[in-house]
Design a protein with these regions (language model features):
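PP2C/PPM-type serine/threonine phosphatase catalytic domain
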Residues: 1-283
């Protein structure tokens, strides 16, 4: 059979014939998914384009979660990243709420897998009643298990919150943050966490096979008045200088408004926002 002039391998551009499953020259699987960057039908099973090398977006480009009590979460790819490497969990547990937010370390491989593994593992552990330390250790093991070597070690930051009538327990490692937005003036947020970073901005604590010993920060607090707990990745907090948080609407409305602000400010990173109302009904 003669090659069809209109068909060529998207990787090596050699002619291929109708019905071929693989390119005879380079071995590329024909009919592969199309790359969102260069348009070639050349995406391999690992999610990379064999022509331009771009890693493809996941189904996490934009997602929202809302619980019956009003707590809400929004995560978005942003405007500059090829995929969303943030991950979040928001779970109802009796009269409380559990949230975990992890930001994949961009310099590590498969950072989106790291954040997803940490969030899934820690969220389930906290919802089952395990301590913050136990949940963190399990999440660390789940992320470390993704590594094929010390040079191929997916990594992510970590923050969790268990919130309920008795107060809030926060735990974190890295630079993903939590804020308290007081009910009388939610526009003025109070930072509750401390970043694990050096003066030039690089993080000094993370989850991953190459993280070494990581000391988990744990903080408990009992707000004396109604308000909202905000947990967010740096895709939001890097744009908070001079910003007043929304002062009205449901937590989902407020989270969407914060996302709009981050995107309007440049949207250079993935954005994840969780808002948990405490002490009163919002919206």
């Amino acid at each position: 059979m003669e090659p069809l002039a209109s068909r060529a391998c998207p990787v090596c551009e050699s002619p291929v014939v109708q019905g071929d499953l693989y390119c005879e020259r380079c071995g590329h699987a024909l009919g592969a998914p199309t790359c969102t960057s260069c348009g070639a039908a050349a995406v391999d099973q690992e999610g990379y384009c064999e022509r331009c090398g771009a890693r493809q977006p996941t189904g996490r480009d934009h997602a929202e979660t809302v619980l019956d009590g009003g707590a809400a979460a929004v995560t978005d790819r942003g405007l500059r990243r090829a995929r969303n490497e943030d991950a979040m969990a928001l779970l109802a547990t009796g009269d409380g709420v559990v949230t975990v937010v992890c930001d994949g370390v961009g310099s590590s491989p498969r950072a989106d897998e790291a954040s997803a593994a940490a969030v899934s593992t820690a969220g389930a552990a906290l919802a089952a009643g395990l301590s913050s330390q136990e949940a963190f250790e399990l999440a660390g093991k789940a992320v470390a298990a993704l590594a094929t070597s010390v040079h191929d070690a997916p990594a992510c930051t970590y923050v969790s919150a268990v919130a309920g009538p008795g107060g809030i327990t926060l735990s974190w490692a890295g630079d993903t943050r939590a804020y308290w937005l007081p009910g009388e003036d939610p526009g003025q947020g109070v930072l509750l966490t401390e970043d694990d970073v050096v003066p030039t901005g690089e993080i000094t604590a993370w989850l991953g096979a190459d993280s070494g010993e990581v000391s988990l920060h744990v903080r408990t607090l009992a707000p004396g008045a109604p308000g909202l707990l905000l947990v967010c990745s740096d895709g939001l907090w890097r744009y908070l200088d001079g910003y007043r948080f929304p002062q009205a609407g449901t937590p989902l409305d407020m989270a969407r408004e914060m996302l709009r602000h981050a995107l309007a400010s440049g949207g250079q990173d993935n954005v994840t926002i969780v808002l948990i109302p405490l002490g009163a009904t919002h919206g």
